[in-house]
Regions:
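Conserved acidic donor-binding segment of nucleotide-sugar-dependent glycosyltransferases
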Residues: 392-393, 397-404, 413-419
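Short hydrophobic beta-strand element within catalytic cores of glycosyltransferases
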Residues: 377-380
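Short alpha-helical donor nucleotide-sugar binding micro-motif in glycosyltransferases
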Residues: 125, 347-352
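Conserved donor-binding/catalytic core segment of Leloir-type glycosyltransferases
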Residues: 4, 255-274, 280-287, 295-298
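Aromatic "clamp/platform" in nucleotide-sugar-dependent glycosyltransferases that forms part
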Residues: 360
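N-terminal subdomain of nucleotide-sugar transferases
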Residues: 1-87, 92-99
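Nucleotide-activated donor-binding/catalytic signature segment of Leloir-type glycosyltransferases, i.e.
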Residues: 309-339, 343
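A charged, aromatic-enriched C-terminal amphipathic alpha-helix characteristic of glycosyltransferases
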Residues: 419-436
Length: 436
């Protein structure tokens, strides 16, 4: 069987083989590809398991003997000048052949649909001749372009990741009205104010809707993503499929004795939806209970702390975060780490006393999954699909989305109660072993 993956990024193993730069985003894709490449007969590739159900809604899985004959192709956006990339690579310990295809996409403006992508996908489909197309995510317009030209909904599967419509609806994350309406020079020049960012998510949601209406199958893992996808297209066949994380997170174990006292780790904080401002608002209460508390944030910095040039580029949300840091006297208590590799992320998880996911909405965040695999005590918003993967008081602590007092209480409990932290850690590892 020939399966074509359509991805949002060039996966690191492919980029390394082609001597290209690569993104560390969407690490779980590397996880599932790695599992396929390092399995001798390829029988563990979950995307292939729904092929029979494409002809027979109801989800019957096909046998391993068919999956073993799988041939994989992967399409992904590439840098300008490499749009015609079409190359067979030998990857992994078993030197499995993977057909790799590039396509052009304006990743700076994912809200814009470019019909020129359709011609490229037609070339890719004609060359690879897939039996099944598996589109990972609904966030980018290339998914709809591919599904449109393939035009075989019974053989098209979309893996639900984040859902643009829920991101758009929750984007403001309780920001004050004046902050929502504010703009910096950077925002004006890039036409990228907070309001415009939300509108772009609504535009992306339109392409997401078109995609889900043009396919027959989706994979998901939460009540949240199932409800939203079936509201958009009630005729979809929904397949439950948990994710595989990056291999680095399947080894190692959090130990409270090896953590930095008071260290709080979050994986992202560069736009409102991720809720970094909630944590900053909660810090005064947290510091009353744990004076050594401090925050480390992975990902891009929007705080404008790297000289005049970075100050000029600061967005309105970054200015708001800076004001919260000053107002709550958190200078020296917040450190933004930049983009981290999997190994670097793992080190930060293991050195932290707690991982916090304060987002306004998430489906099932990979950052929570990685923390659970390592046994890092987790505190997360009760929102979206998170309650499906975090059982409150067992595999983490939940607080109401946007309730900074509950957030502070959860963080304080874990930072000050070593026995609770150890119990959560053990339960999280048990949960993660079943889910991921």
């Amino acid at each position: 069987m020939r399966v074509l993956w359509v991805c949002n990024i060039m996966l690191p193993v492919i980029a390394q083989a082609l001597s290209q730069e690569y993104s560390v985003r969407e690490g779980w894709l590397s996880g599932i590809l790695g599992r396929y490449l390092e399995t001798e007969n390829g029988a563990e590739l979950s995307a292939a398991d729904v092929t029979d159900s494409a002809a027979s809604p109801g989800g019957r899985q096909q046998g391993a003997e068919t999956v073993a004959a799988l041939t994989l192709g992967i399409a992904f956006p590439v840098a300008p000048g490499r749009e015609e990339l079409s190359q067979r690579l030998q990857l992994g310990s078993y030197k499995k052949e993977v057909a790799c295809y590039g396509f052009a996409e304006d990743l700076e403006h994912p809200e814009r649909y470019d019909s020129a992508m359709e011609a490229r996908f037609l070339q890719i489909l004609e060359d690879f001749q897939p039996d099944l197309v598996h589109i990972f995510g609904t966030e980018f317009p290339h998914g709809y372009a591919c599904a449109k030209v393939f035009h075989r909904p019974e053989r098209t599967l979309v893996g639900l990741q984040g859902l643009c419509i829920s991101c758009a609806d929750n984007y403001m994350a309780d920001l004050p009205e004046n902050v929502q309406n504010s703009r910096t020079l950077r925002d004006i020049l890039k036409k990228d104010s907070i309001r415009q960012q939300q509108e772009k998510f609504y535009q992306r949601a339109e392409n997401e809707k078109k995609l889900l209406l043009s396919v027959g199958h989706v994979t998901g893992r939460t009540t949240f993503d199932k409800t939203i996808s079936l509201e958009i297209n009630p005729s979809l066949v929904y397949h439950t499929m948990n994710e595989t994380m990056r291999p680095q997170f399947y080894s190692g174990c959090w130990e409270i004795e090896k953590t930095v006292p008071g260290e709080i780790f979050i994986s992202q904080g560069d736009y409102p939806l991720k809720g970094f401002h909630y944590l900053l608002q909660a810090m005064q209460e947290i510091l009353q209970n744990c004076p050594e508390a401090h925050i480390k944030v992975a990902g891009i910095s929007v705080l404008g702390v790297n000289g005049i040039k970075s100050r000029i580029k600061i967005p309105a949300y970054g200015k708001y975060l800076r004001r919260l840091i000053l107002k709550n006297r958190l200078e020296g208590k917040v450190r933004v780490l930049g983009n981290l590799s999997a190994e670097e992320m793992k080190r930060e998880y293991l050195s932290a006393q707690i991982f916090v996911c304060p987002s306004a909405v998430e489906n099932s965040p990979n950052s929570v999954a990685e923390g659970q695999l390592l046994g890092v005590p987790v505190a997360a918003s009760r929102t979206g699909g998170i309650p499906d993967v975090v059982k409150d008081g067992v595999s983490g602590l939940l607080f109401e989305k946007g309730n900074v007092h509950e957030l502070a209480a959860c963080v304080s409990r874990i930072l000050t109660d070593k026995q609770l932290a150890k119990e959560l850690s053990a339960s999280e590892r048990e949960t993660a072993a079943k889910l991921y």
